[in-house]
A protein has these predicted regions:
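Single conserved hydrophobic/aromatic residue that forms the stacking wall/gate
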Residues: 1-10
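Gly-rich Lys/Arg/Thr-decorated short loops/hinges at beta-loop-alpha junctions or inter-strand turns
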Residues: 22-28, 62-75, 160-179, 194-199, ...
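A glycine-rich phosphate/pyrophosphate-binding beta-strand-loop-alpha-helix module
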Residues: 38-41, 45-118, 167-173, 182
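Glycine-/charge-enriched secondary-structure boundary and capping motifs
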Residues: 116, 208-228
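Short, structured beta-strand/loop micro-motifs enriched in basic residues and often containing a Trp
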Residues: 119-129
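Acidic/histidine-enriched ion/cofactor-binding microenvironments in catalytic or ligand-binding pockets
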Residues: 128-150
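Short, Lys/Arg- and Gly-enriched loop/turn segments at beta-strand edges
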Residues: 148-160
Length: 228
């Protein structure tokens, strides 16, 4: 299509639209910057694995009164002021790095959120229907791991949200929150947006906190992995 016809061509195409929301209440509670950043990054990953391009986002949060003096912080908790400020910085940082506009932000304040913060990120993605295929795997198909470096946080990071915590946990548990890599995820978005790339992919999973056993294990009934 030329420029004058482009708008009409877009209307005439069949499109796939993905909606995804992600809650990062616990990660943001223990490490607010990283927890909120990877809330957005994790929400983007799922539509990306479906080969759709994420183009808009929404953020909804819940916190107790951030003006309460730090001296009144409950033992074992981070101050509400720290949670509110650093979570906002983390979410914004990731969005700015990856180039995603958040068109709607809602902050809810209620005393009950002192028990645990609410951090929700939601996104929408879209791709031309002709660019995406979802097929069963066949013998001889290749599995490719593509993306940034994955450390121990990306292999077993999800376990941190399931174990018991106490008043001393906040001194060490922040390290369990996964570290985001927005520039690399941005490169993957741009790669998958190319139809000649997207169209040759039969199946795709995002490499979440469940690690390689989940991301690869779901692709076929049986497979061989040579992982260095």
């Amino acid at each position: 299509c030329d420029r004058r016809q482009r708008q009409m061509c877009i209307r005439d195409r069949e499109w796939l639209v993905n909606f995804k929301n992600e809650t990062h209440n616990h990660p943001t509670e223990i490490e607010p910057f990283g927890g909120a950043a990877t809330c957005l990054g994790g929400a983007i990953r799922d539509p990306l694995s479906g080969r759709t391009y994420v183009y808009q986002a929404m953020r909804v949060t819940g916190a107790a009164d951030p003006t309460v003096p730090v001296s009144q912080t409950i033992e074992g908790k981070l101050p509400q002021k720290k949670l509110v400020r650093e979570a906002a910085h983390g979410y914004s940082s990731y969005g700015n790095q990856i180039g995603l506009a958040t068109g709607y932000v809602k902050e809810v304040y209620h005393p009950n959120y002192v028990a645990k913060r609410m951090e929700i990120g939601a996104v929408m993605g879209a791709a031309p229907r002709r660019a995406v295929q979802r097929l069963n795997s066949d013998p001889g198909d290749k599995i490719i791991l593509l993306g940034g470096r994955t450390g121990r946080d990306g292999i077993g990071g999800a376990t941190g949200s399931s174990k018991a915590h106490n008043t001393k946990s906040t001194s060490v548990c922040g390290a369990e929150v996964q570290k985001g890599n927005a520039p690399t995820e941005r490169k993957l978005q741009r790669l998958f947006r190319r139809e000649e790339v997207s169209h040759i992919i039969k199946k795709c999973n995002d490499f979440g906190a469940g690690g390689v056993s989940v991301a690869i294990g779901e692709l076929a009934d049986g497979l061989r992995i040579e992982l260095d």
